[in-house]
Swiss-Prot record:
Belongs to the DNA polymerase type-B family. This is DNA polymerase catalytic subunit. GO terms for biological process: DNA-templated DNA replication; viral DNA genome replication. The keyword Secreted does not apply.
Length: 1041
């Protein structure tokens, strides 16, 4: 197929003359104002060239499809993409036309202007903007009156029942906040002055002041107070007024609550769900959105349909971009560099029900055919970006996904739009929409946190989802799809892309197929992990948008729920100033009694400990007693909590006032129980997924309540609540331990509470029940001398039931979590054991569980640990050895069974020094948490590898990736690891020697740390002791290059 570049003469493939133009081509503008900067790789007309051709062009931007030019402005005007009525999809056929097609005429509206019909529609996102009445003269007065002179409009984005994209503009939702009034006249006077100053700054807005009686959520109170309620038609002006009043030291309440949150909370609406709409007004012209159907209504016209949980068939799109660096060394591209251009963009379009998939590729220059892919050729990067954005606008995806798109693809597209002065927000669901990216602070736990906003579209980055949901050695796309899908990416390296792209049409097709395949894989991950269902369940429960679920964390979820609950009780939430520096002690860990236990150890676990503490002790902002109210309450009305720091917090009991947090938790837990019951009897596969995600959302939200109160920089922190929760948790652990140690060593008592133990054989010399460890919400109970294991295990539920009934107020409950048949308890947070009924080991905090340990060390250490539990000879030997004194070791020697364990280590050393260990088993890794130059400590092995890759002009890893490296042989045995770190692929290719001494030392260290309790107490350096037990042998020194 010939490709004609209308801006540069071609002596290559194709004609010098343009294809026959359509009638729409007659409209040309060549004014300087309409000219755009055309950047074109010279390779598309002169193969293998690395130059860029630049000139200003006054022609209309266009793309080429099937050799025919298509003007982009005509596509946008008629909302018609050139691909339509295409049956062929991925070399197969589908019923109907390509789902990219939008009709070129106005959609058949289900209603007419001002008629009495009802529209049923589903929403997934809300957009908020301010409007001026002079711009909406065409609207009926019932809507326009809310815009005088300016007003807030909430646009609900979704679909009607027949699948039509809809934007419902809701009028009449005011923004408001409260001001505490000590002196009403003085307060009103101060407000008037603030508003007068704002008017001078041209902030036109109507507002109303009225006195209301409310109670603050913060602190127990029995009397209402007078507050000034400030109601604004324009929320931007309202927020500015609140800030000015705060600066004047007025106490402000709820000024950070957004209008769409007010809309949802005040009217008990739903952020993700179905609505019915009475008497809508249909916008035929002057639309604010790019949706097919746009309606206007008042708040009172809407009715939420809470019983409906099904989804309309939303449109989705996975995309990926490929870039070309303009630097001589093909360095990693940077959007701010004018010569680092986007060369290809792939889009895979599919519906939420996953019934159809179409594949599209936008490319610079001509491209050979790729089976099943629609190819759109562009002559310049400007036209490539415009074509892609036009495609997004015409297709109108509701969900956009990709892999690392938040940190790279979307910011890169936005950066190039900024370079060309393209208003990318106009291509969103809203005509005055936003397409922005904010890069937040980087940290180890929140790598490269980028918040992306595309008005009316949900952004789900599968890289972030996989980071949270998938445990993998690294989270590169190739690794994740191999684990989850059993598939591989196309084998095109970063360095091959420029070479292939510059070569010819076929080379660009190889790069294009690679680009499209990445989007296909992301589509499959999207449908595999189903995070959109989980996010929608959380959004629905918390009354926030899905995008807030994705980007804003747990704080906004709990705050919105609390706002709704407080409103029902007539309480208002104070706006918190910058939090103080006070801290509190976190969860308790009981000091472990380390050792190897060749006897059952039961783990008793508190069910939902922190939520149940909040419920049991009525902890809340509104039940917290301040000094002013202590004297007016009786002792029996108060729960006192004393912390380890000596601070005392007091809360009223439920009969005085019920905790709002407790009510929320009780409601959520009851709902979760009901949902799980429904799930047991559900037969529909999709409904099973929805119910499962709903119960998971309820669980996650319950567990987030405690954290919400304890984050000092959060939306509404309360140190007293967070500190009281952990203090009560410590008390519960201590009481449980004391009760078990005091009462459970009486065999008669045990048979009374657990009839299963009657007539059970017991070794009176060995009988002992003790708590050997406690961690946050669980206790480890040693059970010695009870010889019938089956009876013992069947008695455990009675043990915890008795403890719960005797010690704890409801709903605090102790449960049997698991039972270890053998346990190696190393220290706090570190143990390994064999669970009853299972053969595999259960570990926590052991070196071989961590990802920065190589496979050789991990597997050998695991083999040694397994031998402790599977080989009785070794088990008995190490148990005996752990209790030996120095004199006993000198006289008797070490138990023979211990040397069976040593033999495993000796064999591993032989394989290592004889080069029988695969290099991939020797890989170490670390996460690149930030750019190399931002590290305070530069002498780190993984940074050495990144720098070496840069020097060799290899593909550079992204922030958040795990960097793999191996340690090379070196004449100095004490050389630092960062000096000898190297990329494993490079080592394998060049057959470099491995530093066997380093790896064997790491092995010895890992094993000693993992089994340290088996060594006698008099041994101060177990690693040296273990090394001395391994027979010595001399190996040839490596030949260094």
């Amino acid at each position: 197929m010939a490709f004609f570049n209308p801006y540069f003469k071609s002596k290559n493939k194709g004609s010098d003359m343009p294809p026959k133009q359509s009638m729409s081509f007659t409209k040309q503008h060549k004014t300087k104002e309409s000219a755009f900067l055309s950047i074109t790789p010279e390779c598309i007309i002169k193969p293998k060239s690395s130059k860029l051709l630049k000139k200003y062009n006054g022609e209309q931007p266009r793309l080429f499809y099937n050799g025919e030019p298509v003007l982009l402005y005509t596509v946008r005007e008629i909302s018609q993409w050139p691909v339509k009525d295409i049956m062929k999809v991925n070399n197969g056929t589908v019923d109907g036309s390509c789902n990219v097609v939008s009709t070129s005429h106005e959609p058949d509206s289900p209603v007419k202007n001002n008629c009495e019909e009802t529209v049923v529609f589903h929403i997934y996102e809300q957009c908020v903007f301010c409007a001026h009445d002079v711009s909406y003269e065409y609207l009926p007065w019932r809507y326009k009156r809310f815009l005088s002179p300016t007003g807030t409009i909430i646009s609900l984005i979704g679909k009607t029942e027949d699948g039509t994209d809809v934007c419902v503009n809701v009028h009449g939702q005011a923004y408001y906040f409260y001001v505490a009034m000590k002196d009403e006249a003085a307060t009103r006077d101060a407000v008037s002055k603030v508003m007068s100053n704002l008017e001078k700054e041209s902030s036109s807005c109507s507002y109303v002041m009225k006195s209301v009686n409310k109670m603050s959520l913060m602190g127990f109170n029995t009397n209402t107070s007078s507050y000034l309620m400030m109601i604004f038609s324009n929320h931007f002006v309202g927020k500015e007024a609140a800030r000015n009043l705060k600066d004047l030291d007025f106490e402000i309440f709820e000024h950070l609550v957004e209008p769409n949150t007010r809309f949802l909370v005040d009217n008990e609406f739903c952020s993700f769900g179905w609505y019915s709409l009475k008497t809508p007004y249909v916008r035929q012209t002057s639309k604010d959105s790019n949706c097919e159907l746009e309606l206007d209504c008042c708040v009172g016209d809407l009715q939420v349909l809470r019983d409906r949980v099904d989804w309309p068939n939303y449109k989705c799109m996975a995309f990926d971009i490929e870039c070309l660096s303009g630097s001589v060394d093909d360095a990693f591209p940077d959007a701010t560099n004018p010569d680092d251009i986007i060369i290809q963009i792939s889009c895979v379009c599919f519906d939420i029900k996953n019934t159809i998939e179409t594949q599209h590729l936008f490319t610079l220059g001509s491209c050979a055919e790729i089976p099943g892919v629609y190819i759109y050729e562009c002559a310049s990067e400007y036209e490539l970006i415009e074509s892609f954005l036009t495609f997004v606008r015409v297709y109108g995806p509701n969900f956009i996904t990709g892999y690392n798109i938040n940190a790279f693809d979307i910011p890169y597209v936005i950066g190039r739009c900024r370079y060309y002065n393209i208003q990318c927000g106009a291509f969103t669901k809203m005509k005055r929409g936003r397409m922005t990216c904010f890069k937040g602070m980087e940290s180890f736990l929140n790598r490269c946190q980028c918040k992306v906003t595309i008005s009316g579209i949900v952004i789900i980055d599968m890289y972030r989802v996989c980071m949270d949901k998938v445990s993998a050695p690294n989270h590169k796309l190739d690794t994740v799809v191999d684990m989850l899908l059993g598939e591989k990416k196309h084998s095109v390296s970063y360095k091959q892309i420029p070479v292939l792209f510059r070569r010819d049409d076929d080379g660009r097709a190889v790069v294009g197929a690679y680009c499209v395949h990445d989007s296909v894989l992301v589509h499959k991950l999207f449908c595999k992990l189903l995070f959109h269902y989980e996010a929608s369940a959380i959004a629905r429960l918390s009354n926030i948008s899905i995008n807030k679920v994705v980007f804003d964390g747990q704080q906004s979820r709990i705050f919105t729920c609390m706002l709704a609950a407080a409103r029902r009780e007539g309480l208002i939430i104070p706006s918190i100033d910058e939090a103080g520096e006070d801290t509190y002690q976190g969860a308790t860990v009981l000091e472990p009694k380390t050792g190897f236990y060749n006897t059952p150890v039961a783990v008793f676990d508190f069910a939902s400990l922190y939520p149940s503490i909040i419920q049991a002790y009525n902890l809340c902002y509104c039940t917290l007693i301040t000094d002013n109210y202590v004297a007016s309450l009786r002792e029996e009305d108060i729960t006192m909590v004393t912390t380890n720091t000596g601070r005392v917090h007091r809360f009223v009991k439920p009969h005085v006032r019920k905790s709002i947090l407790s009510q929320l938790l009780t409601s959520w837990l009851a709902e979760r129980k009901a949902v799980r019951e429904k799930l047991k009897h559900c037969k529909d596969p999709l409904m099973q997924i929805l119910l499962d995600k709903q119960q998971l959302a309820l669980k996650l939200t319950c567990n987030a309540v405690y954290g919400f109160t304890g984050v000092s920089k959060g939306m509404f922190p309360c140190l007293a609540i967070a500190e009281s929760v952990t203090a009560q948790g410590r008390q519960l652990l201590a009481v449980t331990k004391q009760y078990i140690c005091d009462r459970f060593n009486d065999w008669t008592f045990l048979t009374q509470i657990a009839p299963e133990l009657v007539d059970c054989p017991v070794d009176s010399n060995r009988f002992k029940i003790d708590v050997v460890y406690g961690d946050t919400d669980s206790v480890f109970v040693l059970l010695c001398g009870i010889e019938n294991a089956d009876r013992l295990y069947s008695a455990l539920p009675n043990f915890v039931a008795h403890i719960t009934k005797t010690l704890f107020p409801p709903p605090i409950k102790l449960e049997v979590d698991k039972v270890f048949e053998k346990l190696l308890l190393l220290c706090k947070k570190r143990y390994v054991g064999v669970l009853h009924g299972e053969e595999k080991l259960s570990m926590k905090g052991i070196d071989l569980v961590r990802r920065n340990v190589c496979g050789f060390v991990k597997n050998t250490t695991l083999a040694v640990i397994k031998s402790l539990f599977s080989d009785n000879v070794i088990s008995e030997a190490v148990q005996k050895m752990s209790g030996m004194t120095q004199d006993q070791v000198c006289k008797e020697g070490l138990p023979p069974g211990f040397f069976k364990l040593v033999a495993l280590i000796t064999d591993a050393r032989e394989r290592l020094y004889e080069n029988r260990v695969d290099i991939h088993e020797l890989q170490l890794s670390a996460t690149l948490t930030q750019a190399c130059d931002k590290y305070k400590q530069q002498n780190l092995p993984h940074l050495t590898v990144v720098r070496k890759k840069l020097e060799r002009r290899e593909e550079i890893p992204n922030t958040g990736d795990r960097i793999f490296y191996v340690l090379l042989a070196h004449p100095d045995e004490r050389v630092a690891n960062y000096v000898i770190a190297e990329d494993p692929d490079y080592v394998e290719t060049h057959r470099l020697q491995i530093n066997c001494s380093k790896y064997f030392s790491n092995l010895i260290s890992s094993i000693t740390h993992s089994i340290s309790p088996i060594f006698p107490e008099f041994i101060s350096k177990p690693d040296r002791f273990l090394m001395s037990c391994v027979p010595r042998k001399t190996y040839p020194k490596p030949i260094l290059n």
